[in-house]
């Protein structure tokens, strides 16, 4: 009888489990029912409108899923996020989100409490798709993932739903709509292709949308960062990409060296753990072709991508790069990829490959990550707390970050590979003056505090805790005014804080001794505080003060209007927002002067802008001051030399398909309210630019090399291009475009040539030569290599073009040209305005052979006929980050079109 009772109880329990599982399954719409085909069908792509509708429908059909609009895109579309977990978890979602936040921020959470919360909480996993829109797999596999999560009832899926909260996010809606529609526009499936897009697949950045995450300049990035670092704090962030290395199917973590030196070691071991789960699942399912580490170029060095920025918030950022296209492809035969090895456990045979296979590989990867999170839920939750607490503790004591250049110097000091003593270690790697800062203070009395506030907002968007001084205070015998910003190191996101303020030191990384350098994944150095020209103090000891935590974002303090009843008002050229105020005044049809000498009666340097009192009401200035943060000072009429400013007619070069460098410049011009038109190669080659424009901006990549390489036929591919885009086809060449650009300048126009386009100076016949060449030979990469890094320029104040700049300027330099001015250059109107005056110009990153840069000229003003050429070889508009260099662009726009007629 007892056995029967137990058996009956067991049967009842079994029936309960089956009933519960069955009850959790609703009849949901399949992709075939919604779209008429399965996800990944040959020659088919779903667009974003269809994805959005499908997610909305599934959310209405399933109690496992809700959808949220996390913000608008740059083109105004709602950006959708699906939140998927068990119905029971949905009922307590706010509690689980708060647990995730508490453990990630760590502050005030003791270890005992952290362990308890780790047991109570749920793992939060972010999986996205579609960031790089032409990598079409990401967005398509996301729909398959969401469908499977709300429709499957197998034990693994139910366990994942119980233990994990999945955030499934389309991260580039505009791009998905563009690319899918472009592919599907052809009625004949055999003619469909994602190639030949007429515009960037993100309004401003294109592929660079995955380079914006520490700056957060784009709408989509800001939406994503808010969810990741201010709301949900996922332990895992999985970013889908394409394509896999040739001869494989996909690349997955772990990643190659070097790691960033600010990262917690648990990031590296955590990536190894998830990587093992990923590769183990592929092998167990017989899905070959998954490679890792040396199989690709991906590392954990760079900050700034959707995968990499999470590392600096103690989150495990994952990336897969997977082959596949709705048009079937071939896996090529690569003999070296056919032998099993540590970084490629199971090779894949070459042959035809269909998109549906890529969808299945993506789901294997998704389920490996979700299963890992479910099985290791408490470890993930506790470890994010542990990493956060490690950061807090490091920020509260003396610590030293061991950096490559210091290690190299220590090895040289010891000599010949000899081992040293503990005292040597402390002497060479723990000198008191080299310890990590406990925090950073950004004084509010700096001239360009508006840009400093924009820097602080980039930190805040990334979840960093920033304080504001409520009154004057002193640290280390230095007095700081109220309103100064304080960023302390004793916080969970300390790795990001250090990475934004401190220089990066990329190790010397070569294929073999004496061999070529191994290019870093993206930039080698990027210190944002340097790029933005923020003035700050490093504080090496603990400090306190009258500080309040900033909630939300920081507002640029309202400017003031000082004095009245004078001849006019001046405002400071050193404040980048002065150009915003200037453009608004000019849009009001007010006359503004540029003072070439310091104004009388106010402590401002040369370059201040002046407007007469009869040109503007004081109330209008008060409004501008409140809107822009710019201060206006009443002064007597200037007596020195001035330039009259007018709203210039600006042309910005672009190309068919979109230039990312031009796209970023377009955003900068819009942000500062410049009027401009975009022009293309055929319009430039048509001549007569001068009748329509005063200024032409040629961004990096516009001008071909003087040897004739580059450029393209004006009619190439025109037959496949919609009529409204055909006037954009073609490239500037030495024969078509360059002569017309030079004619534009000679006729009185201003040409601003940035980055590689500065070689326009050679075409103009300016007395320039290649500074880096020796005896006509350019150095090899084993002799000289400067991947994207921050370098320090010496600025010469011999022209209004450098007004607003200090004596030194940090610029992003990426194997850019460097010039020598030939003797007598100044007599023909060619002036050096910025150059490398030391043999160690590197500020942040990597520059092999940097001593070769010494003496090289990077900023040039040149007279050409009645007009001017401004040659800026650094990337002065780099990804909307290099605010410190923006005055070069803005000055160039206004200076070239100004005249010397007085306005008073």
Which residues does each PLM region occupy?
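N-terminal secretory signal peptides that target proteins for export/translocation
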Residues: 1-3
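Acidic, glycine-rich active-site loops and adjacent beta-strand->loop/helix elements
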Residues: 131-133, 169-175, 215, 244
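Short, solvent-exposed turn/loop segments enriched in Gly/Ser/Thr/Pro and often Arg
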Residues: 168-172, 183, 239-247, 757
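Intrinsic-disorder/low-complexity accessory segments
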Residues: 24-164, 205, 211-212, 217-219, ...
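Divalent-metal coordination cores built from histidine and acidic residues
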Residues: 161-166, 171-211
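Feature marks short, surface-exposed loop/turn motifs that line or immediately flank catalytic pockets
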Residues: 174-175, 244-246, 326, 704
